Protein backbone atom coordinates (compact mmCIF):
# COMPACT_ATOMS: atom_id res chain seq x y z
CA UNK A 1 0.00 0.00 0.00
CA UNK A 2 1.44 3.38 -0.94
CA UNK A 3 0.38 7.01 -0.97
CA UNK A 4 -0.04 8.05 -4.62
CA UNK A 5 0.61 11.76 -4.12
CA UNK A 6 4.31 11.64 -5.00
CA UNK A 7 3.64 9.64 -8.18
CA UNK A 8 0.97 12.11 -9.28
CA UNK A 9 3.41 14.98 -8.72
CA UNK A 10 6.21 13.17 -10.53
CA UNK A 11 3.99 12.32 -13.52
CA UNK A 12 1.45 15.18 -13.69
CA UNK A 13 0.64 14.49 -17.35
CA UNK A 14 -0.09 10.78 -16.81
CA UNK A 15 -3.63 9.77 -15.92
CA UNK A 16 -3.72 7.92 -12.56
CA UNK A 17 -5.36 4.97 -14.32
CA UNK A 18 -2.24 4.61 -16.50
CA UNK A 19 0.11 4.28 -13.51
CA UNK A 20 0.31 0.57 -12.59
CA UNK A 21 -1.71 -0.22 -9.47
CA UNK A 22 -4.31 -2.80 -8.55
CA UNK A 23 -6.91 -0.82 -6.70
CA UNK A 24 -7.59 2.18 -4.51
CA UNK A 25 -8.17 1.37 -0.86
CA UNK A 26 -11.86 1.69 -0.04
CA UNK A 27 -11.89 0.36 3.52
CA UNK A 28 -9.61 -1.08 6.15
CA UNK A 29 -9.85 -3.33 9.17
CA UNK A 30 -7.44 -4.07 12.02
CA UNK A 31 -7.87 -7.17 14.17
CA UNK A 32 -6.30 -8.46 17.37
CA UNK A 33 -6.15 -12.20 16.71
CA UNK A 34 -6.52 -15.11 19.10
CA UNK A 35 -6.06 -18.73 18.10
CA UNK A 36 -9.71 -19.17 17.20
CA UNK A 37 -11.17 -15.68 17.16
CA UNK A 38 -10.53 -12.01 16.58
CA UNK A 39 -11.40 -8.58 18.00
CA UNK A 40 -11.66 -5.61 15.69
CA UNK A 41 -9.76 -2.60 17.04
CA UNK A 42 -9.53 1.02 15.84
CA UNK A 43 -6.94 1.55 13.13
CA UNK A 44 -4.02 3.70 14.37
CA UNK A 45 -3.27 6.79 12.26
CA UNK A 46 -0.36 5.14 10.43
CA UNK A 47 -2.76 2.47 9.13
CA UNK A 48 -5.31 4.92 7.72
CA UNK A 49 -5.08 4.03 4.04
CA UNK A 50 -8.36 5.13 2.46
CA UNK A 51 -7.53 6.60 -0.95
CA UNK A 52 -4.07 5.00 -1.09
CA UNK A 53 -3.12 2.48 -3.78
CA UNK A 54 -2.35 -1.21 -3.63
CA UNK A 55 0.62 -1.68 -5.97
CA UNK A 56 3.15 -4.26 -7.09
CA UNK A 57 6.57 -2.74 -6.43
CA UNK A 58 8.16 -4.76 -9.25
CA UNK A 59 5.51 -3.72 -11.79
CA UNK A 60 5.70 -0.09 -10.71
CA UNK A 61 9.52 -0.08 -10.87
CA UNK A 62 9.43 -1.62 -14.35
CA UNK A 63 7.01 1.06 -15.55
CA UNK A 64 9.06 3.85 -13.96
CA UNK A 65 12.23 2.54 -15.62
CA UNK A 66 10.46 2.81 -18.97
CA UNK A 67 9.54 6.42 -18.22
CA UNK A 68 13.15 7.15 -17.25
CA UNK A 69 14.48 5.61 -20.47
CA UNK A 70 12.14 7.78 -22.50
CA UNK A 71 13.76 10.78 -20.81
CA UNK A 72 17.25 9.57 -21.73
CA UNK A 73 18.26 7.42 -18.77
CA UNK A 74 20.43 4.38 -19.53
CA UNK A 75 19.50 1.18 -17.69
CA UNK A 76 21.90 -1.68 -16.93
CA UNK A 77 19.68 -4.73 -16.38
CA UNK A 78 21.19 -7.92 -14.94
CA UNK A 79 24.15 -5.89 -13.69
CA UNK A 80 25.17 -5.67 -10.05
CA UNK A 81 27.26 -2.98 -8.40
CA UNK A 82 30.05 -4.68 -6.47
CA UNK A 83 32.18 -1.87 -5.11
CA UNK A 84 32.05 1.85 -4.34
CA UNK A 85 34.70 4.05 -5.91
CA UNK A 86 36.01 6.67 -3.48
CA UNK A 87 38.69 9.05 -4.71
CA UNK A 88 40.22 11.79 -2.55
CA UNK A 89 37.35 11.68 -0.08
CA UNK A 90 34.62 11.76 -2.71
CA UNK A 91 32.35 9.02 -4.06
CA UNK A 92 32.90 8.96 -7.82
CA UNK A 93 30.91 5.88 -8.90
CA UNK A 94 30.80 2.10 -8.64
CA UNK A 95 32.44 -0.99 -10.10
CA UNK A 96 30.03 -3.51 -11.63
CA UNK A 97 30.33 -7.24 -11.03
CA UNK A 98 32.02 -9.67 -13.37
CA UNK A 99 29.83 -11.66 -15.76
CA UNK A 100 30.42 -15.14 -17.10
CA UNK A 101 31.74 -16.86 -13.99
CA UNK A 102 30.89 -20.42 -12.95
CA UNK A 103 29.52 -21.64 -9.63
CA UNK A 104 33.02 -21.85 -8.17
CA UNK A 105 34.00 -18.41 -9.46
CA UNK A 106 35.97 -19.68 -12.41
CA UNK A 107 36.03 -17.71 -15.67
CA UNK A 108 33.82 -19.19 -18.39
CA UNK A 109 34.09 -18.63 -22.14
CA UNK A 110 31.55 -15.81 -21.80
CA UNK A 111 33.54 -14.01 -19.09
CA UNK A 112 33.35 -10.21 -19.01
CA UNK A 113 35.17 -8.27 -16.29
CA UNK A 114 33.33 -5.64 -14.29
CA UNK A 115 33.54 -2.03 -15.39
CA UNK A 116 33.80 1.31 -13.65
CA UNK A 117 30.66 3.42 -13.89
CA UNK A 118 31.48 6.96 -12.84
CA UNK A 119 29.06 9.78 -12.06
CA UNK A 120 28.96 13.23 -10.51
CA UNK A 121 26.42 11.91 -8.00
CA UNK A 122 25.89 8.28 -6.94
CA UNK A 123 22.37 7.68 -5.56
CA UNK A 124 22.18 4.76 -3.12
CA UNK A 125 18.80 3.05 -2.80
CA UNK A 126 19.74 -0.49 -1.77
CA UNK A 127 17.25 -1.11 1.01
CA UNK A 128 18.28 -2.87 4.22
CA UNK A 129 21.98 -3.36 4.91
CA UNK A 130 23.08 -2.50 1.38
CA UNK A 131 26.69 -3.50 0.89
CA UNK A 132 27.53 -0.29 -0.97
CA UNK A 133 25.68 1.97 1.47
CA UNK A 134 27.36 0.14 4.34
CA UNK A 135 30.81 0.95 2.96
CA UNK A 136 29.88 4.61 2.52
CA UNK A 137 28.32 4.87 6.00
CA UNK A 138 31.42 3.31 7.54
CA UNK A 139 33.90 5.37 5.52
CA UNK A 140 32.25 8.65 6.53
CA UNK A 141 31.40 7.47 10.09
CA UNK A 142 27.67 8.11 9.71
CA UNK A 143 26.38 5.52 12.19
CA UNK A 144 27.76 6.84 15.47
CA UNK A 145 24.31 7.77 16.79
CA UNK A 146 22.05 5.40 14.87
CA UNK A 147 20.31 2.38 16.37
CA UNK A 148 19.60 -0.50 14.00
CA UNK A 149 16.75 -2.96 14.44
CA UNK A 150 15.50 -5.31 11.75
CA UNK A 151 12.36 -7.19 10.83
CA UNK A 152 11.72 -10.07 8.45
CA UNK A 153 8.65 -10.20 6.24
CA UNK A 154 7.36 -13.16 4.24
CA UNK A 155 4.50 -13.00 1.80
CA UNK A 156 2.43 -15.06 -0.59
CA UNK A 157 0.26 -14.00 -3.52
CA UNK A 158 -2.93 -16.01 -3.91
CA UNK A 159 -5.57 -16.30 -6.58
CA UNK A 160 -8.82 -16.39 -4.63
CA UNK A 161 -12.37 -17.48 -5.37
CA UNK A 162 -14.05 -14.33 -4.05
CA UNK A 163 -12.86 -10.72 -4.14
CA UNK A 164 -11.48 -8.99 -1.06
CA UNK A 165 -12.58 -5.37 -0.69
CA UNK A 166 -10.78 -4.18 2.43
CA UNK A 167 -7.15 -3.77 3.42
CA UNK A 168 -6.64 -5.93 6.52
CA UNK A 169 -3.94 -5.81 9.21
CA UNK A 170 -3.66 -8.10 12.23
CA UNK A 171 -1.57 -8.40 15.37
CA UNK A 172 -1.42 -10.95 18.14
CA UNK A 173 -1.65 -14.68 17.41
CA UNK A 174 0.33 -16.66 16.22
CA UNK A 175 2.97 -14.56 18.04
CA UNK A 176 3.29 -15.08 21.78
CA UNK A 177 2.81 -12.31 24.33
CA UNK A 178 5.27 -11.76 27.16
CA UNK A 179 8.65 -10.23 27.90
CA UNK A 180 10.41 -13.60 27.82
CA UNK A 181 9.43 -14.14 24.16
CA UNK A 182 10.10 -10.60 22.86
CA UNK A 183 7.92 -11.34 19.82
CA UNK A 184 6.26 -8.50 17.96
CA UNK A 185 4.87 -8.08 14.47
CA UNK A 186 1.72 -8.61 12.50
CA UNK A 187 0.16 -9.50 9.18
CA UNK A 188 -1.40 -7.87 6.18
CA UNK A 189 -3.94 -9.08 3.64
CA UNK A 190 -4.31 -6.76 0.64
CA UNK A 191 -6.65 -7.02 -2.35
CA UNK A 192 -4.91 -7.18 -5.73
CA UNK A 193 -7.83 -6.69 -8.09
CA UNK A 194 -10.87 -8.94 -8.03
CA UNK A 195 -9.20 -12.34 -7.95
CA UNK A 196 -5.88 -12.02 -6.11
CA UNK A 197 -4.67 -11.12 -2.63
CA UNK A 198 -1.29 -10.53 -1.03
CA UNK A 199 -0.92 -12.04 2.43
CA UNK A 200 2.16 -11.72 4.57
CA UNK A 201 3.60 -11.56 8.06
CA UNK A 202 6.36 -9.38 9.55
CA UNK A 203 8.29 -10.39 12.68
CA UNK A 204 10.85 -8.32 14.59
CA UNK A 205 14.22 -10.08 14.49
CA UNK A 206 15.11 -9.59 18.15
CA UNK A 207 12.86 -12.42 19.34
CA UNK A 208 14.21 -14.70 22.08
CA UNK A 209 13.28 -18.10 20.62
CA UNK A 210 15.93 -19.07 18.07
CA UNK A 211 13.60 -21.71 16.61
CA UNK A 212 10.92 -19.18 15.63
CA UNK A 213 10.32 -19.18 11.87
CA UNK A 214 8.55 -16.28 10.18
CA UNK A 215 7.52 -18.67 7.40
CA UNK A 216 5.95 -21.04 9.93
CA UNK A 217 4.15 -18.15 11.62
CA UNK A 218 2.51 -17.24 8.30
CA UNK A 219 1.47 -20.84 7.74
CA UNK A 220 -0.11 -20.86 11.22
CA UNK A 221 -1.98 -17.66 10.48
CA UNK A 222 -3.48 -19.25 7.37
CA UNK A 223 -5.17 -21.87 9.58
CA UNK A 224 -7.15 -19.18 11.45
CA UNK A 225 -10.87 -19.47 10.57
CA UNK A 226 -11.08 -15.85 9.36
CA UNK A 227 -7.99 -16.05 7.14
CA UNK A 228 -8.89 -19.54 5.96
CA UNK A 229 -12.22 -18.16 4.77
CA UNK A 230 -10.48 -15.56 2.61
CA UNK A 231 -8.16 -18.09 0.97
CA UNK A 232 -10.62 -20.98 0.69
CA UNK A 233 -10.96 -22.27 -2.85
CA UNK A 234 -7.87 -20.36 -3.99
CA UNK A 235 -4.31 -21.26 -4.91
CA UNK A 236 -0.90 -19.86 -4.04
CA UNK A 237 0.88 -18.29 -7.01
CA UNK A 238 4.14 -16.87 -5.64
CA UNK A 239 6.13 -16.58 -2.43
CA UNK A 240 8.81 -14.17 -1.29
CA UNK A 241 10.66 -12.71 1.69
CA UNK A 242 12.68 -9.62 2.56
CA UNK A 243 14.23 -7.81 5.49
CA UNK A 244 12.82 -4.49 6.66
CA UNK A 245 14.49 -1.71 8.68
CA UNK A 246 12.53 -1.33 11.90
CA UNK A 247 14.33 1.49 13.68
CA UNK A 248 12.71 4.34 11.76
CA UNK A 249 14.23 7.78 12.22
CA UNK A 250 16.62 6.42 14.90
CA UNK A 251 18.27 4.21 12.29
CA UNK A 252 19.05 6.96 9.80
CA UNK A 253 22.67 7.93 9.22
CA UNK A 254 23.77 11.23 10.73
CA UNK A 255 23.69 12.71 7.21
CA UNK A 256 21.80 11.64 4.10
CA UNK A 257 24.53 12.87 1.78
CA UNK A 258 28.30 12.77 1.49
CA UNK A 259 30.61 14.23 -1.15
CA UNK A 260 29.46 12.67 -4.43
CA UNK A 261 26.64 10.50 -3.04
CA UNK A 262 23.27 10.56 -1.33
CA UNK A 263 20.96 8.04 0.33
CA UNK A 264 17.31 7.78 -0.72
CA UNK A 265 16.24 4.42 0.70
Predicted feature locations:
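Predominantly flavin-linked oxidoreductase catalytic cores and closely associated redox partners
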Residues: 56-232
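FAD-binding beta-loop-beta segment adjacent to the flavin cofactor pocket
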Residues: 242-264
